[in-house]
Regions:
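Catalytic or ion-translocation cores adjacent to nucleophile or general acid/base/metal-coordination motifs
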Residues: 2-38
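Acidic, glycine-enriched catalytic cores built around paired aspartates
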Residues: 24-234
């Protein structure tokens, strides 16, 4: 489902699922930050080879270009070539270069056929982050399915229209640059409106927000009391 293939602009299924993840991260960025919050992780995020506390998505040049085409014209008509990698040894042929990158400054990165959530602390159980990720992606896929099932007319046109809507509304969460730079922190917070919750104290209230309680109870993941109890424990 998250394998773009050689021509991702033609892979509607991939684009729909990728867009659903983009929407999920954009809508629930505060909760994603909160679910990895701890005193130790506050010191780690943004330094020492760790991503910043600002939740953004790295897609790589190829996929970013595809979604930019969709945002501009409503559909993508081409995909950038991945290119080749040469290492300067004549006896070794050029190797195909992966279209994704290893941008270690991104907290949520696409790496070929999957997304990596890199903000989780090294000594933290992955249970809560996985529970949240599964829930927010399920909600986003629910939204996508509801929109497409209600669409009238040509189905492919409805898919393209939905992709454009998601990218236009949530594309601000996509960032392929240096997450450590001061310029990005200013751009993210002031130009893009992305949350920058630097401390656990700032982040944790997102777990008991009205949106969080509604999300977990709607999909029968946690009751309101269970949500509140986890907040108190954290």
């Amino acid at each position: 489902l998250l394998d773009p293939g050689d021509t991702p602009h033609e892979n509607a299924r991939f684009l729909v699922f990728c867009a659903a993840v983009i929407r999920a991260v954009s809508v629930n960025a505060k909760m994603l930050r909160a679910i990895v919050a701890s005193a130790g992780n506050d010191h780690r995020l943004g330094a020492n080879e760790a991503p910043p506390a600002i939740i953004s998505i790295f897609l790589g040049d190829q996929l970013s270009d595809v979604f930019e085409q969709i945002a501009r014209s409503g559909e993508a008509t081409s995909s950038k070539e991945s290119g080749t990698l040469t290492i300067g040894v004549d006896t070794i042929p050029a190797m195909p270069k992966h279209s994704g990158d290893r941008n270690r400054t991104s907290p949520f990165a696409f790496t070929g056929n999957k997304f990596e959530f890199r903000a989780v602390a090294s000594n933290q159980s992955i249970a809560s982050p996985l529970t949240l990720l599964s829930t927010i992606v399920a909600e986003s896929l629910d939204y996508v399915a509801t929109e497409l099932e209600a669409a009238e007319g040509d189905f492919n046109s409805a898919v393209q229209a939905l992709l454009k809507e998601i990218v236009t509304e949530h594309g601000t969460v996509i960032f392929n640059g240096d997450g450590y730079s001061d310029a990005w922190h200013k751009e993210a917070e002031f130009d893009r409106g992305l949350p920058n919750l630097k401390t656990t104290f700032d982040a944790l209230p997102a777990l008991v927000s009205e949106d969080a309680v509604e999300l977990f109870t709607k999909y029968n993941v946690l009751t309101e009391r269970e949500v509140e109890s986890r907040y108190e424990v954290y």
